[in-house]
Amino acid sequence: MNKVPLLEMRNITKSFGKFQALKGVDLTVFSGEIHALMGENGAGKSTLMKILAGAYTTTSGEILIEGRPWSIKGPKDALNAGISLIYQEMQLAPNLTVAENIFLGSELSRGGLVQRKEMVMQTQAVIDRLGAQFKASDLVMGLTIAEQQQVEIARALHRNSRILVMDEPTAALSTRETHRLFELILRLRDEGMAIIYISHRMAEVYELSDRVSVLRDGQYVGSLMRANLNANELVRMMVGRPLSDLFNKERDIPLGHLRLKVHHLTDGAKVQAVSLQVRSGEIVGLAGLVGAGRSELAQLIFGVRKATGGTIEIDGVPLVIHSPREAIRHGIGFLTENRKEQGLFLELAAQDNITMATLERDACYGLLDRKKARAISDDAINRLNIRVPHAQVRAGGLSGGNQQKLLISRWVAISPRILILDEPTRGVDVGAKSEIYRIMSQMAREGVAILMISSELPEVVGMSDRVYVMHEGRIAGELHHPDITQENIMTLATGVTEDHKKEVYHD
């Protein structure tokens, strides 16, 4: 690293009225460095970066570029300093071409005429440098999210940016797209660019970052070099308590009777003769690689997918579940893995989202009982500690953690016998994860049978009483404590023990 930092933010404070969002924050970034910025939602990460990008002005503090004070009062000042910020929500015009987006606001012209051919040529040169597959003449609306992200990066390169800020860039990307993005980020770093990478995903931070800085409650907590990265220390820095305290699972919860019994359930495609059981008060983990059939199994149980064979029993009673409505009537709740596309009604109020699954139950002659709906939503908001100013706030405006708790509260409201959670903490920060784990443990204590699908192995190990592992549509094995380890789960998930897999169905 160079001795003189490319960027220094010193003693940055920012107040919104009486609320102080940042309290004397420091941040130092060098050329050729990937600098991760971590912290819970509300820690001040986005506010700090918006100050750097000129979207906000500081209340006090100073910014230095290569050791020289630099006044950033607006976006133009940031661009002149070589700073570009890629927001989580893309800042592109979908009806314009890639080239038109790259040059938007700075179009090439000669004699009053826009030089479109030259703009396309220059844009294509940047696209080729990135190794992207789209063309400069393509409309942005026809590109994937990953490609739109590349357009944002291309725009930063076109502007000769030296500092690139990326806010949760993998939130909407597939595993393959994420891998390609990482390759590009590493290449840009090797070319000398400084990259500030905002993320709550530790796996990404471990893979990419040269250094990590942590904010908590609007204050700078500290930084760790790559060689010193430690999950326990990062969690402690972010939430003020060690990783061992993150999981709230109580091992001494007495298990009740057999609540859910699945026998040889099949859909003829993704799920092949799966058998599993969950008892009242038990949290059972369902692990496996992407494409193993875990989500499809959950959809079969909830009636989203049609089963071609096998049986489902609840409390010893055989059932045929044709639809989610029937599943809800039988006391099954299902938290989907994609809350924005498959779970939440983003434009509706928090109250409407909470009571969505109880409308039929609580309606009187087809009319909504608004007083009862308000009571249900208020109780859920208090019980799950959902941070909203009031029950009528729009769901789409909430943080990821509060959106997830909002969805969980929908199923808490039906007083479920069985709760299926598909990636319950995906896209939420460490603090929200801890609260979700607390909610899960509380529901288990109340006798709910919980089937938890998760790709986060520490979560599976920390929260599960037992674990089933799927491989290529089948159960590859079942693990009990103390054999529930990440190594054993991955061995089963990758099919290494396929010839010696354990018998997991109990007659």
Swiss-Prot record:
Origin superkingdom: Bacteria
Primary enzyme class: translocase
SUPFAM superfamilies per record: P-loop containing nucleoside triphosphate hydrolases (SSF52540)
Chain positions recorded as ATP binding sites: G39, E40, N41, G42, A43, G44, K45, S46
Catalytic activity: D-ribose(out) + ATP + H2O = D-ribose(in) + ADP + phosphate + H(+)
E.C. number: 7.5.2.7
Subcellular location per the Swiss-Prot or TrEMBL entry: Cell inner membrane
Any GO MF annotation of the entry: ATP binding
One Gene Ontology CC term in the entry: plasma membrane
UniProt keyword annotations, A-Z: ATP-binding, Cell inner membrane, Cell membrane, Membrane, Nucleotide-binding, Repeat, Sugar transport, Translocase, Transport
Presence of the UniProt keyword Transport in the record: yes
Keyword field contains Transmembrane: no
Residues annotated as domain ABC transporter: 7-242, 253-497
CDD domains linked to this entry: ABC_Carb_Monos_I, ABC_Carb_Monos_II
SMART domains, per the entry: AAA
Membrane-related topology note: Peripheral membrane protein
PROSITE patterns according to UniProt: ABC_TRANSPORTER_1, ABC_TRANSPORTER_2, RBSA
Subunit structure: The complex is composed of an ATP-binding protein (RbsA), two transmembrane proteins (RbsC) and a solute-binding protein (RbsB).
PANTHER family in the record: CARBOHYDRATE TRANSPORT ATP-BINDING PROTEIN MG119-RELATED (PTHR43790), D-ALLOSE IMPORT ATP-BINDING PROTEIN ALSA-RELATED (PTHR43790:SF3)
The family this protein is said to belong to: Belongs to the ABC transporter superfamily. Ribose importer (TC 3.A.1.2.1) family.
Entry function: Part of the ABC transporter complex RbsABC involved in ribose import. Responsible for energy coupling to the transport system.
Protein name: Ribose import ATP-binding protein RbsA
Source organism per UniProt: Yersinia pestis
Upper taxonomic lineage: Bacteria, Pseudomonadati, Pseudomonadota, Gammaproteobacteria, Enterobacterales
